[in-house]
Curated annotation (Swiss-Prot):
Pfam families from the UniProt entry: Peptidase_C6 (PF00851), TMV_coat (PF00721)
Catalytic activity: Hydrolyzes a Gly-|-Gly bond at its own C-terminus, commonly in the sequence -Tyr-Xaa-Val-Gly-|-Gly, in the processing of the potyviral polyprotein
Protein's organism: Barley mild mosaic virus (strain UK-F) (BaMMV)
Record's comment on post-translational modification: The viral RNA2 of bymoviruses is expressed as a single polyprotein which undergoes post-translational proteolytic processing resulting in the production of at least two individual proteins. The HC-pro cleaves its C-terminus autocatalytically (Potential).
Residues marked Cleavage (site): G229, A230
Region named Disordered: 502-539
Family of this protein: Belongs to the bymoviruses polyprotein 2 family.
GO biological process, one term: proteolysis
SUPFAM superfamilies referenced in this protein's UniProt entry, alphabetically: TMV-like viral coat proteins
Matches recorded under InterPro entries: HC-pro, HC_PRO_CPD_dom, HC_PRO_CPD_sf, TMV-like_coat, TMV-like_coat_sf
Name under which the protein is recorded: Genome polyprotein 2
GO MF annotation terms: cysteine-type endopeptidase activity; structural molecule activity
């Protein structure tokens, strides 16, 4: 049976827009008259099937490269009657659950793009349409891809089939292609000539009326919400990404271990240098990332891969290999080991996020998010991607600390002289389900050809003794300069005055303080300076020592009352941290931070600023947790790093730290429990879900009587409880109009909960009830209007029904798009927080330590306009001092 020419023209328009375009790796198959009858991919297996159908085994020998100007549309237009459609015959089919022969009419020349495979359902129907309905069916076919879009739900596809059966009754008994289902990705696929994907299940439906029965029986079922799209493959591959196929990837830990081992060796011998060069040349594998491949065992969060062909690590590796090849020839034997270690240091620094602004580290989630290449079989895996990105951030932060320890640890003399390096494993594992034709192959390049070697004029041999003498003289001059600086610049001293603790600047010896000699002290703003202590009286002075160091630090003169106040506050803070008095910490954090700032002004070497930063961060994190119900792992990781630094400085913590308290409260949050239970109930079907939602509302009402709920807990309780009761009211309502209004209200409440909790929950009961009510209303209105109507009126009514269903489908598409936008925004915000938060935390700690180590704040003591010492407590809510931004930094003076 030939297809109606009008319908065929409509399909040609659809194929131009939604079929996979011909590319350079596709082949054309011609018949005995050299007329094209099919286009196939280079790895397609349908040629044998086509040969069996046409009973012409010579077709397999008639493959020729497709001309660049020939595509699917031109094939159809050139010879629409030269076998454009073929009967693809399987030896057995599972239509209807039984095994029997079934001839199915389908396209041999087209494959639909990812997400539009549902169009294959209409191809067999096109042969059964009567001529009177040809124009209507053509319009139906042309409008459907724009109406449903890519990856519609199964319920939307079945609703369209119901509408098609109503408009075109002759297709009710028509066969449909096999519909496959993947239980792992929760995705349907309407198969084409390529057949059923491996390990996929078969849907028991072989004709249109069986699909309509499935639509009626599946109302409210969860699988009705699963997407219908193409078989699993990557949605697209950018031409700019082709370099990843040949790039070398090596496991991060393997490369780190190789470089750490290299720092322990001696490179005075030629064999040792060759061994390191060979190890670097053989490190890494190609084809780790390809068009059909994404990292072996890509979902293991502990496996992170390093791209050795991306800057900055590629540049440092090239410099290291060039030095091992020819660069060492200009150096003395005694200097080669040191220079090799310096090059290895630079390579290691590029692997640390603490030293390098960019990172070459990838896992599957980071690669997909950065390049926007998503695996279709894992439709909607944003939550898993967030977890993998979070694991990558924690891994890089942890390894940055490990690399820093390696750089510090490898300053000892070299003791090994004969070394064979640790080479990474022979080949990475390939997880099941990945294409077997894309196997990673190790790079085995010869050292002399691995890196281009530049021909340069080597400089003359350097004089070792001359360089040693210059170094000794430089060290002596530096020591003299440091001693002179320390002798001329004296530390600030704070002394008791009659009205206020003024800052005193001494310009002479200590005896000048009592004799009136020297430069004296600065004048007060309104008159004479306060009187000095009477001669002969002795003022007790104490020295604030740096608790972070075992050596004696700069002594600071404080009056007894001020020191007593500071010491009491500091001991209170230490006691609160040791006993984990979380309530006291939150209540007094502002006052304690103010005191710690003042203590940092008195002694910049002590870790008072670090402690103030920790207390301020704990307060802000806990406040944010109470308001939003969320605290990221990266934030907690930054607090754990600060706690380790404070322990090293002598601050003792008890069995449970404030960070662990926040972590425990987040894990035991009532809102988290309600959210988890709500997501579980949303997956239930039928009356069980309604009863479970009512029970959840009762549980929430009981727990809301507790007095320790956060603001976010109260908001979550109110939202979830209201929705649970709304669903129960809908189930008890019998009036269709009232029920539809309640469904609209409950759907809005559901979207609000998704926005608040960051979920993507859709209760099947609400969507099923809405579809049922609208379908009934349309059918009742159509039945009333058709009685005694003319054919033109019936056609207009059918078009109106189609417009109603199209409007309903568009509304569901908009709802799904809004949910995807919310999920994408949440994912992007989470990525920014998880990537930037730990890096900023480490950077702030490093900048603050460097700033105070250089005595930045003490420079205020030598400025004549220095006001008063902030000894008294500041007002509550005063922002803490931050390096390079606070009022104490010299760049901010006016």
């Amino acid at each position: 049976m030939m297809m109606n020419s009008t319908i065929r023209q409509g399909w040609q328009q659809v194929l131009r827009r939604f079929s996979i375009p011909a590319s350079g790796d596709r082949l054309i198959v011609s018949n005995s008259t050299d007329q094209p009858i099919g286009l196939f991919g280079a790895f397609d297996t349908s040629l044998q099937t086509l040969s069996q159908v046409t009973n012409d085994p010579e077709i397999l020998k008639q493959k020729s490269n497709i001309p660049t100007h020939l595509d699917i549309a031109s094939v159809l237009e050139t010879s629409p009657r030269s076998f454009p459609w073929v009967f693809l015959t399987n030896s057995f089919c599972t239509f209807g659950g039984s095994i029997h022969a079934q001839n199915l009419q389908a396209f041999a020349t087209a494959e639909f793009k990812s997400g539009f495979c549902y169009m294959n359902l209409l191809i067999p129907l096109s042969f059964d349409i009567i001529d009177a309905h040809a124009d209507s069916f053509r319009g139906f076919v042309e409008q459907l891809p724009d109406t449903l879009g890519a990856y519609p739900s199964l319920s939307m596809v079945l609703n369209v089939m119901l509408h098609a059966a109503t408009r075109f009754p002759e297709i009710v008994a028509s066969p449909v292609p096999t519909i496959a289902f993947d239980a792992e990705s929760l995705q349907f696929h309407v198969t084409d000539k390529r057949g059923v994907p491996g390990m996929w299940n078969i849907l028991k439906a072989c004709r249109v009326y069986e699909l309509l029965s499935l639509a009626a029986d599946g109302i409210g079922c969860e699988y009705m919400l699963y997407p219908v799209g193409a078989a699993p493959q990557y949605s697209f591959w950018k031409k700019s990404m082709d370099h990843f196929i040949s790039d070398r990837f090596v496991e991060f830990l393997a490369m780190q271990g190789l470089l750490a081992s290299a720092l322990e060796q001696d490179y005075k011998t030629h064999d040792a240098r060759d061994a390191l060069l060979t190890a670097l040349q053989n490190a890494g594998y190609t084809n780790v990332v390809a068009r059909e491949r994404r990292f072996p065992n890509g979902h293991d969060p502990s496996t992170v891969w390093l791209n050795l062909n991306e800057a900055p690590i590629s540049e440092k590796l090239t410099e290291l290999k060039r030095y091992l090849l020819v660069g060492h020839r200009s150096d003395e034997i005694a200097d080669i080991t040191h220079n090799v270690h310096q090059h290895v240091f630079e390579v290691l620094k590029t692997m640390s996020v603490q030293f390098s602004k960019t990172t070459n580290a990838y896992n599957r989630a980071r690669f997909e998010v950065n390049h926007e290449v998503i695996w279709n079989a894992e439709y909607g895996r944003s939550s898993q991607q967030n977890a993998e990105l979070e694991a990558l951030v924690l891994f890089l932060n942890r390894q940055s600390l490990e690399i820093e320890n390696i750089l510090r640890r490898t300053t000892s003399p070299v003791v090994v002289t004969n070394w064979q390096p640790d080479v990474p494993p022979a080949a990475p594992e390939i997880s099941e389900g990945e294409p077997t034709h894309a196997v990673a192959t190790p790079i085995t390049e010869a050292p002399t050809h691995a890196t281009p070697v530049e021909v340069v004029n080597l400089p003359p041999t350097r004089s070792y003794w001359a360089e040693t003498l210059v170094g000794v003289l430089t060290a002596i001059l530096g020591t003299i300069f440091a001693l002179l600086t320390r002798a001329l610049i004296r530390p600030k001293r704070l002394r008791r005055k009659s009205t206020f603790p003024w800052v005193s600047l001494d310009s002479g010896d200590e005896d000048d303080d009592h004799s009136g000699g020297g430069g004296g002290s600065p004048q007060t703003p309104g008159g004479q300076p306060p009187a000095s202590p009477a001669p002969g009286t002795h003022q007790s002075r104490f020295s604030v020592q740096d608790i972070a160091s075992d050596t004696s630090l700069l002594s600071v003169d404080l009056d007894e009352d001020t020191l007593s106040q500071y010491d009491e506050t500091f001991q209170t803070i230490r006691r609160a941290l040791f006993e984990n008095s979380f309530g006291d910490i939150l209540q007094n954090s502002a006052r304690w931070i103010s005191t710690l700032e003042a203590m940092a002004l008195a002694d910049g070497n002590a870790p008072y600023t670090l402690l103030a930063q920790y207390l301020n961060g704990i307060e802000e994190a806990y406040t944010n947790f109470r308001n939003t119900g969320h605290i990221s792992r990266a934030t907690l990781s930054g607090f754990f790093v600060l706690e380790d630094s404070l322990r090293a400085a002598g601050i003792a913590f008890g069995g449970t730290t404030p960070t662990q308290t926040i972590q425990n409260q987040s894990a035991d949050s009532p809102a988290r429990r309600w959210k988890t239970r709500f997501e579980q109930i949303a997956c239930e079907l039928g009356d069980a879900s309604i009863k479970s939602l009512a029970d959840l509302a009762d549980i929430i009402d009981t727990e809301r009587e507790r007095g320790d709920l956060t603001q976010f807990d109260v908001l979550a309780a109110s939202s979830i409880s209201s929705l649970c009761r709304a669903v129960r009211i809908i189930s008890d309502t019998t009036d269709p109009n009232t029920q539809l209004a309640l469904v609209e209200n409950a759907t809005a409440m559901q979207n609000n909960i998704n926005a608040i909790l960051g979920t993507n929950v859709s209760i099947p009961f609400l969507s099923a009830t809405r579809r049922l009510l609208i379908t009934r209303r349309i059918q009742e209105a159509g039945a009333e209007s058709r009685s005694g109507a003319t054919p033109d009126t019936i056609q207009q009514l059918a078009d109106a029904e189609l417009a109603e269903i199209v409007s309903e489908a568009n509304m569901f598409n908009e709802m799904a798009a809004s949910q995807r936008d919310i999920a994408n925004a949440t994912r992007e915000a989470t990525i920014r927080e998880h990537v930037l938060s730990p890096v900023n935390a480490l950077a702030n700690v490093g900048m603050a330590a460097a700033f105070f180590r250089s005595g930045g704040l003490r420079s205020r003591a030598f400025h004549p306009t220095m006001p008063t010492m902030p000894g008294s407590p500041a007002a509550i809510g005063r922002p803490m001092f931050q390096a390079f931004r606070g009022r104490g930094h010299r760049l901010n003076r006016r």
